[in-house]
């Protein structure tokens, strides 16, 4: 529709070397693009859930709703929110977060930390990353296991000092076991990624290595956010909460649930999740374009490459034009990155869109996110449309803008009153308040 094409054309016009002409349409202007600045990535995901439910109530088919993101790792929080809300979804052209190879490897080490007799987990990682334990050696362990009626772990422990590489693997797992109950879950996972060599292995690989590293970082973020007390206790043994391994067991149980058979089956209508790259050639009635922060889209890497920004802008053009009727653009002012809370600012691509084709969603009442900080939540659904408005400035500042204070560090403007020299700002500095 007209507003969507106007936004796409306005963005691509900022490229010096443009290919082709602007797209035109005889259709009406249609809905304005809905822009929502969430305080956290968790709130951003919940907004997507709430809007998807509203669209479904209005008669929109789920398979005509798509969620786009710049990198695969961004899907984890969105998947989690859709799963917990019972909204069926599919990952187009990829795997669910907990089904990705690098995540399965990391979780296999975590499983061995609480149960070294898990043969499947041991077989997955005994020689991954490669540590010189060949197929013949593994076959010998399996033979010993079968003949003596013992687990592969017990066979590995019995291999003796002569089997130096197996002995080194045994020491690695023993070291992980000693951390259980002594360290937070997230720190144990960080240790696994480092001590197992997983992170270093993927750093040396070509192709999609950065995607895999980003996913491993996101696994650490998931562990930081995870609350064992919110687990599905039906999948865990009785009285497990007193076990030192409880946080790990609960996390593994949660991961198994989210990677199970809950993804929509063949022929079932479901929300489509995909990267912007994967969306090329596809169109949907409603599209959520998420993670629209500087350094994320455009990506930080592209900003350092010659021609990278223009390529990212072409991708933005693709993303916008995937929407036939309705487009949502969302960002999070706060995300977990490398295990730390990071503040973000709105993408330059959003600022290149003409204000007249945007509706800005106001942020409403205060609540708490799982990072332990106060945040803002959106107005009820029936008030959303009436609460969209153009951004106002206060003494040169605007709500949602990131600012830096000499004492308190970086913060986000979450409220403002009055204008000019009498303007007063409310700023969230994370833990500083």
Residue ranges and their predicted role:
Residues 29-30, 268, 420-422:
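Short acidic/glycine-enriched loop/turn segments that link adjacent beta-strands
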Residues 24-32, 197, 297, 373-375:
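Short, basic/glycine-rich phosphate-binding loops at helix/coil junctions
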Residues 17-18, 280-285, 420:
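Short, flexible loop/turn motifs enriched in small residues
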Residues 61, 75-87, 100, 107-360, ...:
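Conserved helicase C-terminal RecA-like lobe
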Residues 38, 68, 92, 99, ...:
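Active-site-adjacent beta-strand anchor residues
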Residues 235-242, 353-407, 412-417, 421-424, ...:
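Acidic, low-complexity intrinsically disordered tails
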């Amino acid at each position: 529709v007209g507003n969507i094409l106007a936004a796409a054309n306005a963005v691509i016009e900022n490229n010096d070397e443009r290919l082709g002409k602007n797209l035109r349409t005889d259709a009406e202007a249609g809905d304005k693009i809905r822009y929502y600045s969430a305080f956290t990535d968790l709130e951003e995901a919940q907004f997507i859930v709430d809007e998807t439910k509203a669209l479904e109530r209005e008669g929109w088919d789920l398979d005509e709703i798509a969620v786009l993101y710049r990198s695969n790792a961004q899907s984890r929080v969105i998947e989690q929110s859709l799963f917990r809300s019972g909204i069926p979804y599919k990952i187009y052209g990829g795997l669910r977060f907990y089904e990705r190879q690098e995540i399965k490897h990391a979780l296999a080490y975590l499983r061995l930390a609480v149960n070294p007799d898990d043969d499947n987990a041991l077989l997955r990682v005994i020689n991954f990353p490669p540590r010189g334990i060949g197929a013949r050696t593994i076959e010998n362990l399996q033979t010993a296991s079968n003949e003596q009626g013992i687990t592969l772990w017990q066979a590995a422990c019995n291999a003796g000092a002569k089997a130096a590489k197996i002995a080194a693997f045994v020491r690695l797992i023993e070291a992980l076991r000693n951390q259980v109950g002594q360290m937070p879950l997230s720190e144990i996972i960080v240790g696994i990624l480092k001590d197992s060599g997983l992170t270093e292995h993927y750093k040396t690989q070509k192709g999609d290595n950065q995607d895999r590293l980003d996913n491993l970082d996101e696994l650490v973020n998931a562990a930081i956010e995870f609350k064992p007390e919110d687990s599905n206790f039906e999948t865990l043994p009785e009285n497990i909460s007193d076990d030192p391994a409880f946080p790990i067991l609960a996390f593994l149980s949660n991961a198994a649930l989210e990677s199970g058979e809950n993804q929509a089956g063949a022929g079932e209508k479901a929300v489509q999740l995909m990267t912007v790259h994967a969306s090329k050639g596809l169109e949907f009635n409603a599209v959520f374009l998420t993670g629209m922060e500087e350094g994320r889209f455009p990506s930080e890497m592209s900003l350092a490459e010659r021609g990278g920004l223009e390529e990212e802008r072409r991708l933005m053009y693709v993303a916008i034009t995937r929407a036939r009727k309705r487009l949502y653009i969302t960002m999070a002012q706060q995300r977990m990155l490398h295990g730390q809370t990071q503040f973000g600012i709105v993408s330059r691509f959003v600022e290149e869109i003409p204000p007249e084709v945007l509706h800005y969603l106001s942020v409403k009442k205060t609540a708490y996110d799982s990072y332990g900080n106060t945040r803002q939540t959106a107005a009820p659904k029936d008030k959303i449309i009436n609460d969209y408005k153009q951004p106002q400035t206060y003494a040169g500042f605007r709500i949602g803008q990131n600012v830096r204070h000499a004492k308190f560090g970086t913060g986000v403007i979450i409220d403002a009153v009055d204008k000019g020299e009498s303007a007063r700002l409310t700023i969230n500095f994370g833990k500083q308040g």
